[in-house]
A protein has these predicted regions:
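N-terminal Rossmann-like dinucleotide-binding module
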Residues: 17-62
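Internal alpha/beta domain cores that form substrate/cofactor-binding pockets in large enzymes
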Residues: 25, 50-51, 81-100, 105, ...
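N-terminal beta-loop-helix "entrance" segment that forms/cooperates
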Residues: 58-76
Length: 340
């Protein structure tokens, strides 16, 4: 049994945790906000990393001010040793990790490919937290891919890292339901919290020798590539439900957008019409405005209709549908186009 420090901003609380010290040092690799709950969970469980590795500080926001990644900031608040590394493939960096003699590496959304020597440096190997139920949605954007595909259930997986992309043996998994109106950003926060608990359970199981690894079925794997700006383009031939799923998936970035009267337009808020299929939408070409009221109804594939309740022109503030329609004198029969 050991003492562990749980630290919030401005306060420090000491608690006793019912878990023996890990067999050796833990090295934590992580960069974005998604990785912070896991770092906090490790500290709360008496598994504070001996070293936290994160990517270098970079310019962020409109002002392009240089800022340390969320993991680096939180690790500093927790009093942990932090190392910001531009390239983990560097032999000098790997030498420093080997010299530490780690028991295990924990990797959460770090953002770089690990060479085999780094993966194998810890005695117990390298454990990754992935935000999907592997082998589904391997890749850089599993949360967005699950929401965009209309999945009802996703989850988090811990796996032993190998040279293949998210292809290592599965250690533990935890399912999470996706809310009907939940955005990727909202789901990400829930999965991050669940993932922190799963990492702790995984390390406890590895230390106790109670985890049975199982190989992934590669034939069932799907891929979730990194999001790009072009993913925001609306394909009006899709059903309104599919478009709404993409709207939820691409919040806050890259969003959802099309063109109206030749100028780009961002969809700020929308919902599928109920009932899904309507006579006016069935008779109209996808992308055609069929209703203008408190929501702008746009015909979509399969006779469905998307109700847009807020829109935004570039460089202007968002407007509710009625205000926007009045200002642009928008009437039924107008047409949204795809961004070219």
């Amino acid at each position: 049994m050991q003492w562990s420090c749980l630290q919030a901003v401005g306060t420090t609380t000491w608690v006793i945790v019912n878990w023996m010290s890990p067999p050796g040092p833990i090295v934590f690799f992580g960069t974005p906000e998604f990785a912070v709950p896991t770092l906090q969970a490790l500290c709360a469980a008496g598994m504070a990393p001996a070293r936290v590795v994160t990517q270098p500080s970079r310019p962020v926001g409109r002002g392009r001010r240089v800022q340390a990644p969320p993991v680096a900031r939180r690790a500093a608040e927790l009093g942990l040793e932090v190392e910001q590394v531009a390239k983990v493939r560097s032999s000098s960096f790997i030498d420093r990790v080997v010299e530490l003699g780690p028991w295990v590496s924990v990797v959460v959304a770090f953002g770089q490919i690990f060479p085999v020597r780094l993966l194998e440096a810890p005695v117990a190997g390298s454990v990754n937290l992935h935000a999907s139920l592997l082998p589904a949605y391997r890749g850089a954007a599993p949360i967005q891919a699950a929401v965009a595909s209309g999945e009802k259930i996703t989850g988090v997986t811990t796996m032993r890292m190998t040279a293949g992309l998210d292809a290592g043996p599965i250690l533990l998994q935890n399912e999470v339901e996706i809310g009907a109106d939940e955005t990727a950003a909202e789901l990400s926060r829930r999965l991050a919290a669940t993932g922190g608990d799963l990492i702790v359970a995984t390390l406890e199981g590895l230390a106790a020798g109670s985890i049975r690894e199982r190989a992934q079925n590669d034939s069932l794997s799907t891929f979730a590539p990194r999001l790009e700006k072009g993913d925001a383009e609306i394909d009006w031939s899709l059903g309104s439900g599919a478009i709404y799923d993409r709207f939820r998936a691409f919040q806050p970035w890259p969003g959802l957008r099309g063109r109206l009267r030749g100028e780009p337009i961002k969809i700020v808020a929308c919902r599928p019409a109920s009932p899904a299929v309507s006579p006016d939408s069935e008779a109209a070409e996808p992308g055609t405005v069929v209703v203008v009221s408190d929501a702008i109804g746009v015909a979509c594939g399969g006779g469905t209709r998307l109700e847009i309740t807020a829109l935004q022109r570039p460089g202007r503030r968002p407007l509710d549908a009625r205000t926007f329609a009045n200002g642009e004198r928008l009437e039924a029969g107008a047409s949204f186009e795809r961004v070219l």
